[in-house]
Amino acid sequence: MNTLACIPAFNEEGVIGNLIKETLSFVDSVVVCDDGSFDNTLKEAEKSGAIVIKHNKNKGKGAALRTLFNYARDSQADIIITIDGDGQFLPNEITKLIKPIQE
């Protein structure tokens, strides 16, 4: 099953790169919505292997998630998960999260 991780992010350049790299160990692809960041979130996310969608101004987490869900719908992913961009979610928990869906 094709699994897509969706990450809304705002000014997360310090953690987004490692978060994406770790997440890619458990999913097929990662898409980040850079919600108007002033730092290098976009650059770090791209460098780490994510697809990045950029909001030119900060619209809030809800708008970032809406953008990500629209992308996910069009991507034909079988499983979609969301992870906050601040690094508080442990990517190694993804396996437990999606196991019931895969069964």
What would you call each of these model-derived segments?
Residues 1-103:
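Structured catalytic core of nucleotide-sugar glycosyltransferases
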